[in-house]
Each structure stands twice: as C-alpha cells, then as structure tokens.
C-alpha cells in the first residue's frame, strides 16, 4: 500500500507542556488508522498538527512524500480534509451550502462554483446518504445527519486523506456503527486513507485496520487491534485491568474491564 502520511518523531510543545513526544506512524491508501488512548493522550493534538492547523511541531510529517512544510494551506486542503467533532452548527446555511464549502480550496478568491463543482458536491452527498437533506438547514439535523454532512463536505474537497476527530462522539449506538461503517466504505470505495481519533475501543477494534495507542503524548503500541489491546498495554495506558476477547457470535473484539490497576 502507498503511504499517504508518514509521521516520524513528531513532538509538540504547548503552554509549557510536551503534548506529543516522538510520535511515529504512517497511514496508507485504503486503510483506517485509529488513534486511541485516554483523555489527554494527545489524539486531537496529533490530528491538528498533521493537518497543519497547529504549526511548530518538531520531527517530520510528510504527505504524499512531500514535507508538510512545503504545502501552502490551500494545497494542503486539497490533499487532507478534516472532519471535526460535531459542533452546534446553528448558522443559517443549508446542507448543500455547507457541503459546497468543500470546494473552496479549488476555487480562486472571486471564482464561482462551476457545474463540475456542483456535481462533485452532489456525488459526495449521494455517497453519504445526505442528498435528500440538501435543502434543509444544517441546524435542524440530528447529530448523525450532521456528521454525515461534515463527511460529505470533506469528500467534496477531493482529498487523499481524511482526518476525523472522534467522529462518533455524542451519537447513539446505531449512528456510531453507521458512521464508522460509512467511513470504512468510503476508504475502500474511493481509495482514500483515514486517521481517526476514536474514544470507544470496541468500535476501534471493529472498524480500524490498525490502531495507534497513545499515552501521555507518546506511542505506547501500534499495530492490528488484537495485537495492541493487550492486558499490559491497557493497564499502562488506562490504569485498569482489562481483557480483549473475540465475541463468540460476531468474532469482533470485545473488552471486559476487571477492576482498577
């Protein structure tokens, strides 16, 4: 698989603290890499650093084998699209208008959207099952619908890599599974790569091809979910005694927390 993203020895210092320390991992086309770890481990910070939103990191970040520093913000937005955590989104824009914002990196300052741009946005809405919501105001949608719209906006950028910050936060179980399944389908169907901060370990184990376990800003373990979610790693990262095991009905990894460390 072709590496879309390579991060080597990435560090980030902010407000007197080392938030990231020597983080190394890669993401390839056709795979979903999950960033897991306790609150404060550095997952969201790592996504912001990779995207270029938070400059000043040490180490090396390469996108499509070019240093991140070689990209202008506009050029980077043509390669990497971000899907933030769901916000209120109560501004008076329709779904179609929000999705069309994904074309901004491809347009000049005073350039209007073309028929091709509108076609790209419509295809993204169709892929995310939001086309029937196109004329609704974004603030009237449910959490799951809003998340699909944000993914459609990201697809409209025509990126190579998606960065998703807890895409299932504040969603019920049905929508959590639906969003993660959608991300997986898009990655394989569109040939994209994706890096997602995932809070729920069972969701990460079920849908991610690989996971990167962060603890105190450093990589504690990286690899297939079954290889990373070991009792020793879980104790070191989360401070609990826990055991991952395959569900006898589905084969998906489940997690049992036995007690505190």
Q: What residue ranges belong to the model's regions?
A:
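Helix-to-loop junction immediately C-terminal to a conserved catalytic motif
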Residues: 51
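Catalytic Walker B motif of ABC-type/P-loop ATPase nucleotide-binding domains
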Residues: 162-166
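Conserved ABC transporter NBD signature motif
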Residues: 59-67, 76
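The feature captures the beta-strand-to-loop junction immediately N-terminal to the Walker
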Residues: 36-38
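Conserved catalytic motifs of ABC-family nucleotide-binding domains
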Residues: 158
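Conserved ABC ATPase signature
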Residues: 137-141, 145
